[in-house]
């Protein structure tokens, strides 16, 4: 396992609440939303605009727009001591000075991504079955995500392996940090924790909340109580 450079390694090890948000272009409140969510206890914040209401209305984010949104998130993350993640794009992660690059199964090969972003940023990987989990445990990624636990509109058409995969990963007792992902909200969180997860990724549980800070705080309190 690669040893992450300080202070990113300790920050990742202590993280339990990971938020994926779109750029909120149709609302125009990204800065206020991000600050509220981070104040509520979010440890990592990732920009993922694919399939968002903003994308449907305005079209895909251009690189310059994505960097502008990431600058907003970076400022909020620095104020709150959180990590900033970029989805898929190693070049954007490098340009934004992101702490984390998250790769899906069909994204850049890991060695290529590492050459682009350099030694400092963390790299995460999505996993959806036992074989992918085994690969993520063995390869030089710093963390991995396990799911979807439930079908989710952010990944339309993807079969959800469910909590069975979460239980399997928990039984492996790997030292590498991992996060359960996919359809997790406050009501479902106890099931996820009972399955053995201690870290989660959420989207709508916070992005759709009337009070993002309070929603994040309730999730974080439930996580740290285990």
From Swiss-Prot:
The entry lists its GO molecular-function terms as:
magnesium ion binding; thiamine-phosphate diphosphorylase activity
One BP term from GO? thiamine diphosphate biosynthetic process
Positions contributing to 4-amino-2-methyl-5-(diphosphooxymethyl)pyrimidine binding: 46-50, 87, 126, 155
Annotated Mg(2+) binding lies at 88, 107
Q: Which coenzyme or cofactor does it need?
A: Mg(2+)
Q: What's an example GO cellular component term for this entry?
A: cytoplasm
Q: Which UniProt keywords apply?
A: Magnesium, Metal-binding, Thiamine biosynthesis, Transferase
User: Source organism's superkingdom?
Assistant: Bacteria
Identify the metabolic or biological route this protein is part of: Cofactor biosynthesis; thiamine diphosphate biosynthesis; thiamine phosphate from 4-amino-2-methyl-5-diphosphomethylpyrimidine and 4-methyl-5-(2-phosphoethyl)-thiazole: step 1/1
Enzyme Commission number, as recorded: 2.5.1.3
The record lists 2-[(2R,5Z)-2-carboxy-4-methylthiazol-5(2H)-ylidene]ethyl phosphate as bound by 152-154, 183
The cofactor binding remark recorded in the entry reads: Binds 1 Mg(2+) ion per subunit.
> What's the catalysed reaction?
2-[(2R,5Z)-2-carboxy-4-methylthiazol-5(2H)-ylidene]ethyl phosphate + 4-amino-2-methyl-5-(diphosphooxymethyl)pyrimidine + 2 H(+) = thiamine phosphate + CO2 + diphosphate; 2-(2-carboxy-4-methylthiazol-5-yl)ethyl phosphate + 4-amino-2-methyl-5-(diphosphooxymethyl)pyrimidine + 2 H(+) = thiamine phosphate + CO2 + diphosphate; 4-methyl-5-(2-phosphooxyethyl)-thiazole + 4-amino-2-methyl-5-(diphosphooxymethyl)pyrimidine + H(+) = thiamine phosphate + diphosphate
- Report the Pfam families cross-referenced here: TMP-TENI
Q: Which InterPro entries match?
A: Aldolase_TIM (IPR013785), ThiamineP_synth_sf (IPR036206), ThiamineP_synth_TenI (IPR022998), TMP_synthase (IPR034291)
Its biological function? Condenses 4-methyl-5-(beta-hydroxyethyl)thiazole monophosphate (THZ-P) and 2-methyl-4-amino-5-hydroxymethyl pyrimidine pyrophosphate (HMP-PP) to form thiamine monophosphate (TMP).
UniProt lists the family membership as follows:
Belongs to the thiamine-phosphate synthase family.
**What name appears for this protein in its UniProt entry?**
Thiamine-phosphate synthase
Q: Which organism is it from?
A: Mycobacterium sp. (strain JLS)
